[in-house]
Amino acid sequence: MSAPIIAIDAMGGDFGPRNIVQASLACLTATPSLHLALVGQASLIEELVSAHEAVDRSRLRVIHASEAIAMDERPSQALRGKPDSSMRVALELVASGQAQACVSAGNTGALMALSRFVLKTLPGIDRPAMIAAIPTRSGHCQLLDLGANVDCSAEALYQFAVMGSVLAEILGVATPRVALLNVGTEDIKGNQQVKRAAGLLQAASGLNYIGYVEGDGLYRGEADVVVCDGFVGNVLLKSSEGLATMIAARIETLFQRNLLSRAVGALALPLLKRLQTDLAPARHNGASLLGLQGVVVKSHGSASVSGFQSAIQRAVVESRENLPQRLKGRLETMFQDGRT
């Protein structure tokens, strides 16, 4: 797919369309083959777009949606009470084939509910899972679920593992190492759901399941795909982001204490900048909703301009790789024994 069209929910997130429009236009400039559809209050979006010079309007559409979903709104209200919300209209563009992916920084619960309703799940998948890249010592790993499913059955964890493995392959990992996040690596550790999921994964053909991994093993890069329920995954993700921000702030403070530390800091500045870039939450912003019949990427509600750009770029990669269809083909093979 040479010219993907990405539908952007311009009204979602903590900051409304300001950051979203700026990030979208930056991506449009950086990627000549990209086409975008900005969905939301058309007059406001047009005003923000007009403030930027040299915008290629031939690759940009503004689509009006009369409603927006609040960050604290109940998913049921968003689903039933707002048929013309920017989030829903963006998803419907994907469902109708007018766009290849949707990116939203809006209400996570509403996005999950609307995505399942509008796009439907792939055969063999009960619920989508949120997945994102987590930095490790050797690069990064794919972690799922990140909050879409707080409580998960063993079968759901199994499905997540298969989907995560396929995504890792698409991103260039030849034989992804798949692990379950647990409180220990011994077989006796973990709750019943995790133990049952381990049994399903051990019996699966075509999956490189390596067993359990603990939290520190995740950061050492012991696995390429790490699977857990959404409660654990969300806590881990936000703790990781908070830790990265805290470390960067502490290092900056240490190097500002006195003249000597400032001199040392100046010498180490290139390395520190590289470390800060590698660990910056904005660089890893964008969690995919795997298991849908369409590409959907969830951005942090508080994402910066660069952070939202990362989410758009993730959607571009997944749409170009035709992720849903590749997932569908692999799932048919993995689930042919009827285990779903």
Curated annotation (Swiss-Prot):
Keyword Cytoplasm: yes
Short name of any one Pfam family annotated for the protein: FA_synthesis
Family matches, as InterPro entries: FA_synthesis (IPR003664), Phospholipid_synth_PlsX-like (IPR012281)
Keyword Lipid metabolism: yes
Class of the enzyme per the UniProt entry, highest EC level: transferase
SUPFAM superfamilies xrefs: Isocitrate/Isopropylmalate dehydrogenase-like (SSF53659)
Transmembrane segments: none
UniProt pathway annotation: Lipid metabolism; phospholipid metabolism
EC number, UniProt record: 2.3.1.274
Self-association state and partner proteins as the record states: Homodimer. Probably interacts with PlsY.
Protein name: Phosphate acyltransferase
Gene that specifies this protein: plsX
